[in-house]
Structure formats: structure tokens, C-alpha cells
Amino acid sequence: WRAARALHAADLRHPPDGGRRRRYGDWRVEVVGAVVDRPRDEVYRFWREVSNLPLFLDHVGAAHEIDGVVRGAVDGPGERPVAVIARLVSDRPGEEIAWASTEASEVETRGKVRFRDAPGGRGTEVEAIVAYIPPPGRLGAWIRRRFRRDPDLRGGRGLRRLKRLMEREAARP
């Protein structure tokens, strides 16, 4: 937990080792970002509505929030959904959303999404920092394989999808 707390508190805009380091003890860490040509509050509100997550993160199934606890599922081995249950630990409108998994979650995870005005009035910088500890056994092996090659986190495909979705919606008459 010490590494996770330090990770959560750290400003990982420029992670150690120039961003090459992807492990902190048992924790695996991904940092991705994108610029969305929409106002910061609009991008924040869209992300904050957890039912929107499956629209741009294709490995996330239906998600809902009750009293600051988000329950959802991610694709698991053999089409089996894996429960992710996380408590919101920070919700600063227009700035940051942060979470940490509960003991009931099948995957130990924590992370944050930051929203900043992009330079030159170009919209919003979105930065997602996700840390997780793969569980032991078959599920853990599957998660390690998936996240090692998963373009949703590694290549920022989910954020690119968010960008396209929000910018297209804004362009519609």
C-alpha cells in the first residue's frame, strides 16, 4: 500500500525514468493522455457519468454508481466478467476524479483522471493514471497478459475514442 499511496499522491505528469517505468513493486502502472477539443467542464462531466465509460473504454462493461461507490465489470478470461468495485476518493469538478478499489473488488486498482485547460485554448488535456495489482492464479495471469498488450491503456486507444466521440458530438448540428 505504501507504493500505491505514493503513486496516488505523486504528480505523474512526468513519471520516473521518463515514463519508461511501468512497475512500482507489485503495482503495474499506465499513464496515458490526450487533448480533447472541448471545454474542461464538459469533458469532466462526460467522464464523471460512469455509465458513459463503456462508450469509449471497450473493455469496460456496464457501470453504475451508488453513494460514491462505482460497480462495474471488465472483460475477463473466457468472456467471464471480472467485478471491479471502487470508491471515489477524490472528485474535484472540472479537475480530477480518483478512485481506489474496495476489498470486494476482484482486481486491486487505484487511479485518477486529471483535466486541465490545454495551452492556447485548444480544449482539455486529459491524463489517466491507472495502477493495479494482478490477482494470483489464472485470473491474474490473464490480466497480466491482457494489460501487457492492451491498447486501451498502453496506446491510449480509449482516450482517442473519447476524443473522437466528444468532438464529433460537438460538431453535430
Model-based region annotation:
Residues 2-69, 77, 161, 165-172:
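Hydrophobic ligand-binding cavity/cleft-lining segments
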Residues 27-33, 69, 83, 96, ...:
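Intrinsic-disorder/low-complexity, polar/charged segments enriched in Ser/Thr/Lys/Arg/Asp/Glu/Gln
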Residues 39, 93, 118-122:
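Short strand-connecting beta-turns/loops that link adjacent beta-strands
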Residues 71-77, 97-104:
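Short beta-strand segments that buttress and anchor functional surface loops
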Residues 76-82, 134-139:
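Short, cysteine-centered beta-strand-loop-beta hairpins and adjacent loop/turn segments enriched
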Residues 100-157, 164:
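Beta-strand/loop substructures that line and gate deep hydrophobic ligand-binding cavities in soluble
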